[in-house]
Amino acid sequence: MEAIDTLPSTELENRWARVRKYLAADLPAVQGVMVMSRTLIFWLTGHWGNGLFWLPMEGEPVLMLRKGLERAKLESPVESILPFRSPGQVPKILAEMGQVVPTVVGVDMGNISWAAGQALTSRLEHMQFVSADQALARARAVKTQWELATLRLAGERHSQSLIEKVTEMIEPGMSERDIAKAVWTAMYDLGHQGQIRMNGPGEELYLGVVAAGDSGNYPTVTNGPVGYRGAHPGVPQMGYAGQIWQKNQPLIVDTVFQLEGYHTDKTQVYFGGQSRNVPEELKNAHTMCQEIHSWLADNLRPGAKPSELYSQCLDMVQKQGWENGFMGLGQNQVPFVGHGIGIYVDDWPALAAKFDTPLEEDMVLALEPKIGIPGQGMVGVENTFQVTSQGGVSLTGEAEDILCL
């Protein structure tokens, strides 16, 4: 048997080197990092592992698995892939490999359960565990050329689905649910692989959000600006079968495209009628979002501080009098205007206050200025960008206008 795909060993070595670099800078006392999140194990090994990955500051990494050993050996270039049942076996495994058994260890604390954390501390009592979340986030924020190639392809297909395919499949009179089905069909036909992964504890996402008319301001429980009814209180995703997209109403579609474990984020606003019928308030609000989106893209350069970019956006909004609906209406309002994206949709850094670490070349962020209009809905723009010295380069196309159908 052969693997469907494998990461080059040089790609993994590059990622390991970046993790070690940020561990050394942020946590000089640690002797390595234990990663238990399956998504991060995939990022560090090329295999969506059920177990634990040990990356020492010096020496050979080890992938320890409860299940899937044969598959891991097909998929991952990691040389040491071993079976294990419990974290308590880690010292013996490392000692048998001739490695130093660590006493200070970084852990991906933000991505594991309380029970998993307790298992570490109770079975490895001699070890001191510290959070390596920030070092891991910084390491994965700067994308490799391999990652960028995957994200570009995802972005191209994302744009094609919303701009070319969906426009031929939807029309006023359809329910949000039927529109969501059309969007899903378009994206899946273009290679979307279904799974969407979130970094925030307990957060879930399936496809994204479809909100017709004032659904765009419906109370939301997720950390995003777009309101939506969703399919049901138990599944607050996609769109509601009972909400119909009416003529001369806006429709906002905020979706994620996933390809080979990497995500792009894009929002497209449609209008159920001719452009001359778009209400002036919606036009003006959307133009404001386009101006912010364009300014952010121009300034998405190495050295720029996310907190300062966010502050400037707030100034632009306040000067035009849109502060009450910017990034959500009422309690839907969120305190950011963009976010990192890659193996997670909601990754570091956020374009928000207190995020003062300067951007670096080849970071990838979604920029999403949006404005809610009482009684009408939400408008705005979102694309996924690569940080370059010339400014942000869109990976999800250049379309920003409201598409009138």
Where are these regions (language model features)?
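Active-site neighborhoods and metal-handling regions in enzymes and metal-associated proteins
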Residues: 1-405
